[in-house]
Design a protein with these regions (language model features):
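Conserved beta-strand scaffold positions in the cores of enzyme catalytic domains, especially
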Residues: 2, 83-85, 210-213
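Flexible glycine-/small-residue-rich
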Residues: 7, 36, 87-90, 133, ...
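Conserved catalytic-core segment of NTP-binding enzymes
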Residues: 27, 114-213, 222
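Charged, alpha-helix-enriched surfaces in structured cytosolic catalytic cores
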Residues: 39, 51-54, 65, 108, ...
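P-loop/Walker-type NTP enzyme "switch/lid" segment
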Residues: 39-121, 222-225, 230
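C-terminal lobe/tail of nucleotide-utilizing enzymes
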Residues: 174-282
Length: 282
């Protein structure tokens, strides 16, 4: 399954969520691949060290093959699980190069990403491939959406973010007909008990599952880019990541064994039933 993490704007916690969810599934015995497609503001390299000569940029530029950009970041704690990571080049030169790419190049990249998807799922093969896409509606993020089986849209409670996310889903996502899940991050503690987060948000006739509602936490902010499932097993944020993993499997997954394994990890107080977000047709 290809899962793309996307957001209307930066600063929503999209990257932190993608790398922690990827690590969690690997810890549970899954074969997982995490790819940094935020080519204009890469950040996964701050957590994972590139053990290869090449970057994702090089594959997209037809410099190397797929396996040349994948670094094995598996740990002993993952057992039979596997975590391979493809990192975007963080150098200023590489970022400026990505900024200068034209539409023709981006269209060619879509073909490269589709080949990437086919190869990873059929030849490696992976249970999950996570794309950490650029925020907003630029060609590179649209490519990541088109290649996905499921798109997880991360939003905060900021009004401009919510309205932008709503508009983005209505005007763009429906064109691609992708499965979509919503993660609401950085929710003020005093708002967690409100009906809007516990039940549903009426925005129209279409229903989208809210697979995670994550409270704002100073601990998460000060921890930086931390792999919570490895370093902070009992942290509330870790429990929320497990809840998101459960909901992802419940809604779109195919294996009951994974769900049961997650259930054993999740606190009995956590709600495993996904909520619903509605958005307008027009």
């Amino acid at each position: 399954m290809i899962v793309t993490f996307h957001s209307y704007k930066g600063g929503t916690g999209k990257t932190l969520l993608s790398m922690n969810l990827a690590t969690l599934f690997a810890t549970m015995g899954k074969r997982v691949c995490l790819i940094d497609l935020d080519l204009r503001a890469p950040s996964l390299h701050l957590i994972f060290k590139n053990g290869k000569e090449y970057w994702v940029n090089d594959y997209l530029n037809k410099v190397c093959n797929i396996e040349s950009v994948l670094t094995d970041c598996s740990t002993e704690g993952m057992g039979k699980g596997k975590l391979l990571v493809g990192l975007a080049n963080p150098s200023t030169e590489a970022i400026l190069e990505m900024e200068s790419k034209n539409r023709t190049w981006e269209m060619e990249v879509l073909g490269r990403l589709l080949s990437f998807k086919t190869y990873l799922l059929n030849n490696m093969p992976f249970d999950y491939v996570f794309f950490d896409a650029s925020p907003g509606l630029i060609y590179s993020s649209i490519n990541a959406i088109v290649c996905a089986d499921v798109v997880l849209v991360v939003t905060s409670t900021d009004k401009s973010d919510v309205e932008g996310t709503r508009r983005m889903i209505r005007e763009c996502y429906e064109l691609f007909d992708r499965k979509i899940g919503i993660i609401i991050n950085k929710v003020p503690t005093e708002s967690l008990s409100l009906k809007i987060y516990n039940n549903s948000i009426q925005l129209g006739t279409h229903q989208l599952p809210i697979i995670g509602v994550i409270p704002c936490s100073c601990d998460v902010a000060t921890a930086g880019r931390c792999l919570f499932d490895c370093e902070k097993l009992n942290h509330p944020f870790t429990e929320k990541i497990r809840e998101i993993a459960t909901n992802l499997e419940l809604i779109w997954g195919t294996t009951d064994n994974t769900i049961m394994t997650i259930h054993n990890l999740v606190s009995s107080e956590s709600s495993l039933r996904p909520n619903l977000l509605h958005h307008p047709v027009s």
